[in-house]
Amino acid sequence: KNMRFATRESHSTLCDYLRLARGPHYARDGFFLRAESTYNVASEIDRLKSSGGNGELFMKSYGGVSLHNQSHGESFMAIMKNRFSGHGLYILDEPEAALSPSRQMAMLALMKRLVDQDSQFIISTHSPILMAYPEAEIIELDETGFRSTPYKETTHYRLTNYFLNNTEQMLNELM
């Protein structure tokens, strides 16, 4: 809503089949964030700050510190903590790319706080940690289409679980 930029047209044709419809209880906030675009968001915030006007106020809504002065994961979490205000629709594309396992767990707690404030998340992820969010509807997408899948039946959960429980065997097979 406030930032629209593209360094490359990289969206899939899936967007041609999606339609967001606003109901009577519409979101008052929203954000679409790809882990790999965090750098561009940080650069735009810095540009707005240096251009004067409301730039300083805008910077405060992202934590008051340049996101470039933080690690990738810290800046991603700063966006979620400071910019996501509740009563929103937040669309995140592979946030685990920026986050360590412990930060993914911190993200679950932050999501819970925002969900309790009437927010909704749509997340594209390969992370079994993020998929574990209680009562999440997990839609698994593969070459045959998409389907609702229980958490422990997802491909990513099963593969990660198998690897962690059979590490030596898996490493021998892989190497």
What do the PLM-derived regions correspond to, one by one?
Residues 1-50:
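ABC ATPase nucleotide-binding domain signature region
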Residues 12-14, 18, 66-67, 78, ...:
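Conserved phosphate-binding elements of NTP-dependent enzyme cores
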Residues 42-70:
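Conserved P-loop NTPase mechanochemical-coupling segment
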Residues 62, 66, 70-92, 102-108, ...:
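GG-anchored amphipathic helix commonly corresponding to the ABC/SMC/Rad50 NBD signature/C-loop
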Residues 90-93, 120-125:
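Structural recognition of the conserved hydrophobic beta-strand(s) that form the central parallel beta-sheet
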Residues 96-97:
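Short loop immediately C-terminal to the Walker-B catalytic DE motif
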Residues 102-120, 127-175:
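C-terminal lobe/lid and adjacent interdomain/linker elements of RecA-like ASCE P-loop ATPase modules
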